[in-house]
Amino acid sequence: MSQVRMFVIILLVSAVATVYGQERHGTETGTAPQLSIYKLPPLERAIRCTKYYEGWHGEKKHWPYVGWGHKVLPGESFTNDITKAQGDSILRADMMKLCRLFSRFGRDSTLLSCLAYQVGPYRLLGSKDFPKSKLIQKLEAENRDIYKEYISFRCYKGKVVPSIERRRKVEYLLLFEE
């Protein structure tokens, strides 16, 4: 019985501490601190979102992916034992490169860069093997009603993957600017 009491006491203390912390550290409007991610620049939001969902690729089983999901290209000499600082630097360089590639899309360039980091820019822009995506076609036609097209990049081997769908929705919420 004493273990149950101890558990209930710890649970109550945790709840009180959480409520106290939210009141003490919330913003002027009373919103929770988690919303402070929206105060970051879009590129930083994209990087943090990518790190969260991609996870750390620090083992040999992840090869040819290292760091926060960077695919090692021919001529690169990265290994799986890079530091997190090196992984962060590689991710930022990759995202900046993709932002430059999609810069003609203005405020949507970060959203497209985040998606292209995972699916590859050729899946969006098209290549000899892939047609141009409907997402890019809509943006080129200056139609920014792209939610459905963005979320459509949620399949693996033709099947919808719920975790990828959740990721797309979070990316859209964090990075789409009206």
Regions found by a protein language model. Name each.
Residues 8-15:
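Bacterial N-terminal signal peptides
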Residues 2-3, 7, 19-58, 70-74, ...:
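Long, amphipathic alpha-helical surface segments
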Residues 45, 61-63, 107:
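Extracytoplasmic
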Residues 109-123:
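Short N-proximal segments of mature Sec-exported proteins
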Residues 15, 61-63, 114, 165:
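N-terminal hydrophobic or amphipathic segments with adjacent small-residue motifs
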Residues 102-108:
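Structural motif
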